[in-house]
Design a protein with these regions (language model features):
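Short, ordered loop/turn segments at secondary-structure junctions
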Residues: 69-71, 79, 108-109, 134-137, ...
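Solvent-exposed alpha-helices and their adjacent loops that cap or buttress functional pockets
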Residues: 55-60, 96-97, 122-124, 148-149, ...
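Adenosine-phosphate binding glycine-rich loop
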Residues: 158-159, 178, 282-390
Length: 390
């Protein structure tokens, strides 16, 4: 199927993928007077008296803003807000179709962090949560961290944490397959950008103790003096053995390779230098860091990619619909590490001991159990950690 042609036809024939649908009918004068003036004044008064009533009288409780400035859209790069709109519409569709969550795409003409932060704060009263999307690094770090501190609704950068949660879920099961423990394995991550950094943080939360991050210049270590602040931080908290060099040096004896970088960077020969029962997650799209057959030829036992045409697809759609569904259901003020880890285990635990195998470590994107399982786990963790209003 020619997906490019099909996508153009879909978008043009429907003039986009989302629209506003009224929940009520306005067929009579009474309907009009109830839905709008004069009747609408009463819920306005109630909300004025008690701002929390906005969740009872409006769509806020199930509405997420999908916010982007179009500076890091898929593999297209900085294409601007207008060109990024089809992606944000698509994200809104996935929220609704997979999680029953209403979402509205908002593409803003704002390039610096301060402008994006100001825009999000200005629109926050309308929404129960904000999903940040396709905002370039390093600005995305400052934007998310600031909004998390200054807003009382959940803010979630899916490119970072959605990826991290699903990777963690997949690795939990991959380690179960090979009989290793998170706290014992040596993990190498290639590509410590936004997603890579979040993956490292999530794996550390899950118990990983020996992680090495590798960028285009080599391993990150204490005093590596990177031009990027987050990489200096990674150098301080990872690489406990202070291994210096490149990917070759980092991979020697490694149990796990996680790639969020570029095609072809991992070779069969490099895989042969890894530990027995090696695990490789090659998630560069559309062409991974190594193809599955090449990895298997190098002795890799469990392989995952970001592609749907290979087993073990690492796909963010397993996370964000259910995650926001759970957070919104308890009116969470935040999405904290405990909620993220709960989501990862909820995804992983859907694969039973009987079904788990080298080629089945994570549910498929259309598994109907996923969103509900994630939502329940996230809501429970929110209550247990004190960020839930309900």
């Amino acid at each position: 199927m020619d997906y490019n042609k099909a996508a153009l036809e879909m978008h043009e024939s429907h003039h986009g993928k989302v629209g506003i649908v009224s929940k009520v009918e306005v067929k009579t004068r009474d309907d009009l007077s109830t839905a709008y003036t004069p009747g609408v004044a009463e819920p306005c008064r109630k909300i004025k008296e008690n701002p929390e009533d906005v969740y009872n009288y409006t769509f806020k409780g199930n509405m997420v803003a999908v916010v982007s400035n179009g500076t890091a859209v898929l593999g297209l790069g900085d294409i601007g807000p207008e060109a990024g709109l089809p992606v944000m519409e698509g994200k809104a569709v996935l929220f609704k179709e997979f999680g029953g969550v209403d979402a509205f795409p908002i593409c803003i003409d704002a390039h610096d962090a301060a402008s994006v932060i100001a825009a999000c704060k200005a629109i926050a009263p309308t929404f129960g949560g904000i999903n940040l999307e396709d905002i370039k690094s390093p600005e995305c770090f400052e934007i998310e961290e600031t909004l998390e501190k200054e807003l009382d609704i959940p803010v979630f950068h899916d490119d970072q944490h959605g990826t991290a949660i699903v990777v963690t879920a997949a690795l939990i099961n991959a380690l179960r397959v090979v009989g290793k423990k998170m706290e014992d394995v040596h993990i190498v991550l290639n590509g410590p950008g936004a997603a890579g950094t979040a993956i490292i943080k999530m794996l550390m939360t899950a118990g990983a103790k020996d992680i090495i991050a590798v960028d285009q210049f080599g391993t990150l270590y204490k005093g590596c003096n990177s031009a990027e602040a987050h990489k200096n931080w990674l150098g301080e908290v990872t690489n406990p053995r202070q291994i210096k060099g490149g990917l070759k040096e980092a991979l020697a004896g490694a149990d796990v390779f996680i790639g969020v970088s570029k095609p072809g960077i991992l070779t069969t020969e490099l895989c042969k230098t890894m530990n027995q029962d090696a695990i490789v997650f090659a998630m560069a799209n559309p062409t991974p860091e190594i193809m599955p057959d090449e990895a298997k030829a190098g002795g890799v036992r469990v392989m995952a990619t970001g592609r749907s045409d290979f087993p073990n697809q690492v796909n963010n759609v397993l996370c964000f619909p259910g995650l926001f569904k759970g957070a919104l259901s308890v009116r969470a003020r935040d999405i904290n590490n405990e909620m993220k880890l709960a989501a990862a285990y909820a995804i992983a635990d859907l694969i039973t001991d009987a079904d788990r195998s080298e080629e089945n470590i994570i549910p498929g994107a259309f598994d109907p159990r996923v969103a509900e399982a994630v939502a329940n786990a996230v809501a429970k963790a929110a209550r247990e950690t004190g960020v839930a209003r309900l």
